[in-house]
A protein has these predicted regions:
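A conserved pocket-lining segment of Rossmann-fold NAD(P)-dependent short-chain dehydrogenase/reductase
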Residues: 54-75, 79, 83-86, 95
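Conserved active-site helix of classical SDR/Rossmann-fold NAD(P)-dependent CH-OH oxidoreductases
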Residues: 15-22, 82
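Short aromatic/basic micro-patch
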Residues: 33, 74, 107-110, 163-164, ...
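Conserved C-terminal active-site "lid" loop/helix of NAD(P)H-dependent oxidoreductases
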Residues: 77, 99, 138-176
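Glycine-rich "substrate-gating" loop/helix at the edge of Rossmann-like oxidoreductase active sites
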Residues: 7-11, 37-47, 66-78, 104-107
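Active-site "gating" loop of Rossmann-like NAD(P)-dependent oxidoreductase/epimerase domains
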Residues: 1-12, 25-27
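Mid/C-terminal beta-alpha module of Rossmann-like enzyme folds, strongest
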Residues: 83-151, 179-196
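Conserved beta-loop-beta element that borders a ligand/cofactor-binding pocket
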Residues: 19-43
Length: 196
């Protein structure tokens, strides 16, 4: 399991919720906790992918890169859902409070996801450019926009690589379902209305 020393308010809430589930498991409640990277997928409107990397509902013209040179973990929602279903199907063999990490897609240098979006868009006749995400603008507007303040709280995820180990989920399931990156990105862009 990963160390539980949250540095943010959201992290503290997550830890408290997990502690409550663990305490309830002593009294017969069964819980499976699955931790994953940044979610992306078709029709997923509230995600970094759909709100930070690209603009939904239009062809991909630019791709905003949040942090070049810093690894980042991504989880394709259909893969995460499939993994969760498979874990639930095995719940009788798991301890009452079971924790798992998903490996998903590891973006080694912070560019692989953006480059996958670029490749897929190019296959559909677009010529998107890569640009750095405007963190300066987020800092400037954050005092006036709650969502941007919340975004800044999570910026550490783009400043330091955090990679979860999926050894436990692969030990239980035999493998972790992972759709090839370009296939997952193409389905995501299509679902977000970016491919026409």
């Amino acid at each position: 399991d990963a160390p539980q020393h949250p540095a943010t308010r959201k992290g503290a809430i997550r830890v408290e919720l997990e502690q409550r589930l663990q305490a309830a498991s002593v009294h017969g409640v069964r819980a499976i906790v699955v931790r994953a990277g940044d979610f992306f997928g078709p029709q997923l409107g509230n995600s970094w992918f759909s709100q930070g990397l690209i603009k939904p509902g239009r062809p991909v013209a630019t791709i905003s890169v949040p942090s070049r040179g810093v690894g980042h973990q991504w989880s394709y929602v259909p893969d995460a859902a499939r993994t969760m279903v498979e874990l639930i199907e095995r719940r009788g063999t798991l301890e009452p409070f079971a924790r798992f990490h998903l490996g998903g897609h590891w973006d080694e240098d912070g560019m692989q996801m953006a480059q996958a979006v670029q490749r897929v868009a190019q296959r559909h006749g677009m010529r998107p450019t890569l640009r750095d995400f405007p963190w300066w603008l987020v800092w400037a507007a954050a005092p006036f926009v709650t969502t941007l303040r919340e975004l800044l709280e999570m910026r550490y995820l783009w400043r330091e690589p955090i990679r979860m180990d999926n050894a436990r989920v692969t030990a239980v399931l035999g493998r972790e379902p992972v759709t090839p990156l370009d296939t997952a990105v193409e389905a995501t862009l299509a679902g977000l209305g970016c491919l026409g």
